[in-house]
Regions:
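Active-site-proximal, Lys/Arg-enriched surface segment
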Residues: 46-124, 130-132, 242-248
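Non-membrane alpha-helical segments in proteins
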Residues: 11-13, 110
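Electropositive nucleic-acid engagement tracts
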Residues: 4-5, 16-88, 154, 185, ...
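Domain-level cores of phosphate- or acyl-group-handling catalytic modules
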Residues: 135-210
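An anionic, glycine-rich sequence signature occurring as long contiguous blocks
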Residues: 119-126, 133, 137, 188-253
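Basic, short loop/linker segments at the boundary and entry of helix-turn-helix/winged-helix-like folds
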Residues: 1-10, 138
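Electropositive, glycine- and tryptophan-enriched low-complexity nucleic-acid-binding patches
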Residues: 38-42, 100-163, 252-253
Length: 253
């Protein structure tokens, strides 16, 4: 990067981290009050960026510091999030169901991978989900499951994240292809199983939430909390079922 390009890069990163407005105009106004947003906008939109290469260099830099260095004891979280927006012309913007709001919202839907361990947490990579005007994500060119598998391939084959375990919620755990993809790299996974899923137990199909009264649990202390746990491998698309409840609320996990 040239001197001016480096200055623009520092301006943009500083604005994203500390500015109240994340737009180019807002960043130029707050970080460089005497500067014009035209030069910064040109740097962002017209410079020939390789976003993947830049992100990989960011991750490499994080490994040079003990407090952010990843390890096999860490976890990779796969999830998605809807970022609410107002602009109608933003790339991939549309109406997506937001679980935190409990209703559809206008925004951009990102499927992302996140690294976390006992000392640090930071994003690894992301893919933007676009519905292509389809009401059902199954009709889209790429589903969220497809994007999640792409992320896993990138992290395992290009980045080389050593974390031994992937974590995801019941929605992603519902896709047996995603589970198989994780296992193909010799990695473990932990995911929630929906309580209405049918599993075979004692030669009979039962709902997961009906198992609790038929199993013997074992108490375990985790972070000063007492959980009643039980594990067993069941024939439900090769899921490994783990039922846990705390001693007060009996909440299944």
């Amino acid at each position: 990067l040239s001197y001016h390009q480096t200055r623009h890069a520092k301006t943009y990163v500083t604005g994203l981290a500390a500015g109240s407005s994340k737009t180019v105009t807002g960043i130029a106004r707050e970080v460089l009050p005497a500067g014009s947003d035209r030069a910064l906008n040109k740097f962002i939109t017209e410079y020939d960026w390789d976003e993947d290469e830049l992100n990989h260099e960011r991750l490499e830099e994080l490994q040079n510091h003990g407090e952010t260095r990843w390890s096999t004891d860490g976890y990779i979280v796969i999830d998605d999030s809807v970022l609410q927006r107002t602009g109608k012309e933003l790339p991939g913007a549309g109406s997506f169901y937001d679980h935190s709001e409990g209703e559809p919202v206008w925004g951009q839907d990102l499927v992302y991978a996140f690294y976390t361990d006992h000392k640090t947490s930071y994003p690894l990579a992301f893919r933007q989900f676009e519905k292509d005007e389809c009401e059902d994500q199954k009709e889209a060119e790429k589903t969220k499951y497809d994007l999640a598998r792409e992320l896993i391939t990138e992290l395992e084959e290009e980045v080389g994240v050593p974390a031994a375990t992937y974590l995801f919620d019941s929605w992603f755990a519902h896709d047996s292809g995603l589970i198989a993809h994780v296992k193909s790299y010799g990695k473990d996974w932990v995911g929630s199983l929906r309580s209405n899923r049918q599993v075979e137990y004692a030669n009979k199909e039962r709902r997961v939430d009906a198992l609790e009264e038929r199993i013997d649990t074992e108490e375990r202390e985790i972070d000063d909390e007492t959980y009643n746990t039980w594990t067993k491998t069941l024939p439900v698309s090769k899921f490994r079922q783990c039922t846990a409840s705390d001693s007060r609320e009996r909440t299944r996990r």
